[in-house]
Amino acid sequence: MLLWGLVTLAAILASEAFLRLPVLGRIAEVSATAQKAGRVLRSSRISDHWKERILPAYALRIGLGSATFFVLLCIALLPVLIAGLLYPPGLLAWSEELMRPLVILVLCAISLGYIWLRTRDATRPARSGASDYSALDRTLHRLALGSPMVGEMAMDIEKGLFLKSAPEDSGRHVFVTGLARAGTTILMREIHATGQFGSLTYADMPFVLAPNLWAKLSSKGAKVGTRAERAHGDGIEVDTQSPEALDEVYWRMADSSAYIGEEGLSPHAPDEEVVAGYRDLIRLVLRKTGKTRYVSKNNNNILRIGPLADAMPEAQFLVPLREPLAHAASLLNQHERFADSDPFVRDYMTWLGHHEFGATHRPFLFDGRPEGDPATLDYWLGTWIAAYRALDAAEAAHGNICFIPYEALSGDPAVWAAVARRIGLEPRPAGELKVVCDKAPGAHDAALAAEAAALHARLKARGLAKLGL
C-alpha cells in the first residue's frame, strides 16, 4: 500500500512540475536554433567566413538550451527521487519497483489523469471563441504544434514513408489569400467543393505536417462528425472534413525567424529549399486525398505572394477584395470577439500562425507598424490600405495573381463562373456564396476612407478585367 501511495504522490507532483516548468519551451528553442544553424550551413549565399563566425554562437545557444532543458527535466522528476528516499526498503529497491511494467502503467495513468483534471477548467468556453477540445486533445496539440522539433520530426517520418509514392507536382494549384474577413474562406470552400482539389482539413490536426501517417493512426478522418458554426460567429459551419488554413504551420516550422517578430509579421521571401519543402507537403496532401491539384487558403501568404507566384508559375493566386469600410469593420468586430480568448485558444491561434486580430494580434509590417489603436476603425482601414497597396504591386508584376471582388462574387453568378474558368474548372452553381448585408460603418477618418475607396476601385477594375468581365 505504501508503494502505491508513493507512486501516486510522485506522479502527481512530477506532473504538476512539468506543467509549471517551461520544459517544452526549451525544446522548441533548441530545435529552432538548430534549424537556423542547419540553414546557414547549407546556404550557398553565405560565405564560409561568416559561417565560421556565426555557427559557434549557434552551437553555444544549443548547448546552453540543452543544459537548461536537462536541468528543468531533473527538477520536474525530483518528486520521483524524493519518493524513493521515503521508501523504507531504500532507493535501490524503489528504482527496481519503477522498472516493473505495472508500476510504469500506473505512473502513466495517474500522470495523464492528473493533467486532465488539472487542465479541465481550461475546456470551459470563454466569452469569445473558445474551443471544445478535451484536455487530452489539448495536450496532444501542445506536443504536435507547440514544438518545432516534433513537427520537423513528424514531417521527416512522413516524407520517408510516403513521399516516393506521392503524385508528381503538376503545379496547377490554387492559393486563396488576402486579409482575413475578405471572403477567403468561402471562396476556398467553393473551390474545394468541386471535388477537384485536395486540401488539409480539420481531420489532419494536430499532425498537419504528417497527413498520411496521422490518417493511419487516427480515426478523425473516418467520419465527417457533427457540423458546427466556427468560432468567428459568421454562420460558416465546419466538420472534420472541412478544408482550413493549416499550411501556415509549415512556414512557421521551417522559416519563422525570417518573418515572425515581436512587432509583427514582415514580408517573407523563402529560399528555394524552404519552398521545395512546401511543395513536398503539397504532394503528401495530394497522396492522402487522391487528388492531383491542391487548394489552400492562407492569409499570411500575402507576405510571400510574389516569391510564391514566381516559384509556381502554373498556379493561380486568388485575392478576394472586399469593400474597405465593411472589411475594416469586420476586422474590428473579430478583434473584439477574440480579445478575451482563453489561454489555449491564444496558443492555438499562435501555433497556426493566426495573428490577424484578437489577443494574439501582430500586424503585417508592409509600411511599418500600423498607426493608431486596434480598437478603432481607422487602425483597420490603415491596415487594409497597407496590405492591398502591397498586393497591388505584386498583382501588377504577376499574371497568375488575380483580385476577386468579394461583393460581385457573392451577388453575381457570372463572377463565380469566371473564377472557375480561370482555374481550369467547368463552371457550376455555387453552393455557399450569398449576398452579405454589411452594417453601417462606425466613426472613421473620411480622408482615410476615401484613399481606401480609390485603391479598391482601381484593384476591382483590374480584377474584373483579368476575369474577362
Region roles according to the model:
Residues A203-Y294, E356-F357, H361-F366:
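PAPS-dependent sulfation machinery
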Residues T185-G198:
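A conserved segment at the C-terminal end of the G1
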Residues P125-E168, L332, E336-L469:
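PAPS-dependent sulfotransferases, especially Golgi type II membrane carbohydrate sulfotransferases
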Residues Y58-L86, L98-V103:
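Transmembrane alpha-helical segments and their cytosolic interface motifs
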